[in-house]
Amino acid sequence: MLENYRNLVFLGIAAFKPDLIIFLEQGKEPWNMKRHEMVEEPPVICSHFSQEFWPEQGIEDSFQKMILRRYDKCGHENLHLKISCTNVDECNVHKEGYNKLNQSLTTTQSKVFQCGKYANVFHKCSNSNRHKIRHTGEKGLKCKEYVRSFCMLSHLSQHERIYTRENSYKCEENGKAFNWSSTLTYYKSIHTGEKPYKCEECGKAFSKFSILTKHKVIHTGEKPYKCEECGKAFNRSSILTKHKIIHTGEKPYKCEECGKGFSSVSTLNTHKAIHAEEKPYKCEECGKASNSSSKLMEHKRIHTGEKPYKCEECGKAFSWSSSLTEHKRIHAGEKPYKCEECGKAFNRSSILTKHKIIHTGEKPYKCEGCGKAFSKVSTLNTHKAIHAEEKPYKCEECGKASNSSSKLMEHKRIHTGEKPYKCEECGKAFSWSSSLTEHKRIHAGEKPYKCEECGKAFTWSSSFTKHKRIHAAEKPYKCEECGKGFSTFSILTKHKIIHTGEKRYKCEECGKAFSWSSILTEHKIIHTGEKPYKCEECGKAFSRSSSLTRHKRIHTGEKPYKCEECGKAFKSSSTVSYHKKIHTGENP
């Protein structure tokens, strides 16, 4: 019986209880039961010595005898006595015996040691345990210190190290100890610079398998993390978490100094340097100092002209990654920044901030010289130059001076005729970005400037400003020649031509000359017969925009021109002028 028992153990077939009792009764060294007392299944055989598996039912004696004969050739009788060994170094007897047995067994015979549920052949006891637990879902191993259960002994051992602080894995380089061998292996790679995990796609190596896994997503293009708010997908959960802040507006990172909140820890760290006033990173080219090395590197690209961030869609390159990210939204049509007031969306947070000022009417930028306030810092800077009377930027073409280089560049387009800003909707091009922005409102039907007096809305701020003067009867622009006042400077300029008699705008078709370019444009329509201005209400067309504007008042009933004498209102300025003669006694 004992001999049979030894043979079964050697083959990796766990003994049943009666055999175990007989073995103990014969006075042999007992098994180390401590390791197995929590497991309901038969005890574990050394993973380095044999393949631990329950025996298949109905194995013929002849086959078992054949294996036993091969066992006899290995020539080691006491292999079964070291059943509870956990380390291959402790188990040299097993290791030697296992190698001989492995050479003796054929592939067919090895298949005896299989999982009873699926025909998977395992090479280690630990693997077979994991495999069987997947079928049962059993968690039989309990921690004595904490009320926690584990499927496998290895998991329990790892858990126990946390509270016992058993740092059994020591670094030979500096003596630092770790709970797990995997942590030690990773730590060692810091000293050696070893990167054992290589990407098969591009050859790039990494120190951690988890980093390699993350890297592989670049090649597969897989984006498993999806935003429920806008549907945008990402290849990392951390990027999705950062993205979500756009929708929530959350700023969880707060400055202890001033209480200001930020959406990312990196932005907070950059901000903190403002309080510390530390700027240790200096540009050798221009002397500009920065509070971070990364900011200095970005700044240097201004001097070098380097543009490392390229758009795969159109090939356009950028100096900064943030600029590329913003640019990509043009192709994607993505506009994550939404105005809560009117619902309009933008692809940049800075544009949304500027847009909000339309609704609030806020003018946070004040001139120290005269107290005048502005909605933009750029407009304030331009204004300041009026007080300083500094105009260092001169046009070589016409001699006109400007207080900013950007204004001079814009002015030069008058001479060159350059129109770099094109409308994607209709193809119309403009010399200035502001003109394109205003033009786009025509397609969108947007009229953000609303008159509080009469409720009329306007597409452009300039039109709104002019309109307000109708209610205020304000005419700040006065003619020095005749004293007549006007609501806009452009109308005053046109008026002055009456006194000079100048007619510099000539029609090429008939030779007729005009004082104003707008009148020439309207005159040309006589020759073409074109009527581009159409009433949406009744379909009637006009050759002049002013005629269409006057016509629309028939439908709206609007009477913006008021008589100051009697309060009567009229649809056109000419009608109110005619009416005023009744009060003055002039012949109408």
UniProtKB/Swiss-Prot annotation:
Concerning SMART domains, the annotation shows: ZnF_C2H2 (SM00355)
**What GO MF terms are annotated?**
DNA-binding transcription factor activity, RNA polymerase II-specific; RNA polymerase II cis-regulatory region sequence-specific DNA binding; zinc ion binding
Annotated GO CC locations: nucleus
Ranges annotated as C2H2-type zinc finger: 169-191, 197-219, 225-247, 253-275, 281-303, 309-331, 337-359, 365-387, 393-415, 421-443, 449-471, 477-499, 505-527, 533-555, 561-583
> InterPro entries attached here?
KRAB, Znf_C2H2-type, Znf_C2H2_sf, Znf_C2H2_type
Q: Which Gene3D superfamilies match?
A: Classic Zinc Finger
Establish whether keyword Nucleus is in the entry: yes
GO BP annotations of the record are: regulation of DNA-templated transcription
**Which SUPFAM superfamilies does the record cross-reference, listed alphabetically?**
beta-beta-alpha zinc fingers
Q: Which UniProt keywords apply?
A: DNA-binding, Metal-binding, Nucleus, Repeat, Transcription, Transcription regulation, Zinc, Zinc-finger
Major location, coarse class? nucleus
**What sequence ranges are listed for the domain KRAB?**
1-43
Which cellular compartments is it found in? Nucleus
- Protein's job: May be involved in transcriptional regulation.
Which PANTHER family does the entry link to?
C2H2-TYPE DOMAIN-CONTAINING PROTEIN, ZNF44 PROTEIN
- Tell me which family the UniProt entry assigns to this protein: Belongs to the krueppel C2H2-type zinc-finger protein family.
Q: What is this protein called?
A: Zinc finger protein 676
The organism of origin for this protein: Homo sapiens (Human)
